[in-house]
């Protein structure tokens, strides 16, 4: 594991790239009680065209698919990942930006179990027709919430006016 010391911050960061390409970073915080874990992937709202692994042809997916998948990843075969984190005494969340989707947890107990749960649920997707319909309603409510936020509207209005042809204009 590579050890990187940042003199100005007085912090040591550990980094390892696994055989499967996953990059792992650890930042020990002496004197802190809470553990924070985050899994991030380079797939965000602007990623609407790409060549799938093992294929040669470019495909186009629906706008909003990254945000939709962010929500659906929490659906596990035997329940909901957020509920499983809660059983371990952890809080969990996720977010999608224009270039990334991230899943995270924070906890003061069961750190190893939380890391295992995080790595497990982000690697399996369980979608049913029923869960898709349910998610449509949840995402519609989120959109309405953002539409009521003046700061959000100004920001995305500016982005849409600056980037007429780029997918960053679509949240």
What do these predicted ranges mean?
Residues 2-15, 159-171:
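Histidine-acidic residue clusters that define the catalytic metal-binding segment
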């Amino acid at each position: 594991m590579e050890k990187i010391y940042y003199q100005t911050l007085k912090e040591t960061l550990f980094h390892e790239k696994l055989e499967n390409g996953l990059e792992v970073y650890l930042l020990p915080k002496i004197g802190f009680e809470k553990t924070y874990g985050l899994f991030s992937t380079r797939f965000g709202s602007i990623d609407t065209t790409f060549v799938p692994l093992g294929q040669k042809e470019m495909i186009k997916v629906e706008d909003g698919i990254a945000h939709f998948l962010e929500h659906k990843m929490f659906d596990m075969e035997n329940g909901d990942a957020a509920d499983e984190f809660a059983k371990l005494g952890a809080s969990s969340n996720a977010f999608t930006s224009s270039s990334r989707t991230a899943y995270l947890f924070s906890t003061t107990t069961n750190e190893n179990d939380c890391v295992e749960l995080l790595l497990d649920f982000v690697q399996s997707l369980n979608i049913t027709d029923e869960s898709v319909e349910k998610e449509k309603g949840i995402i519609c409510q989120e959109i309405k919430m953002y539409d009521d936020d003046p700061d959000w509207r100004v920001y995305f209005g500016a982005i849409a006016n600056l980037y007429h042809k780029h997918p960053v204009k679509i949240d």
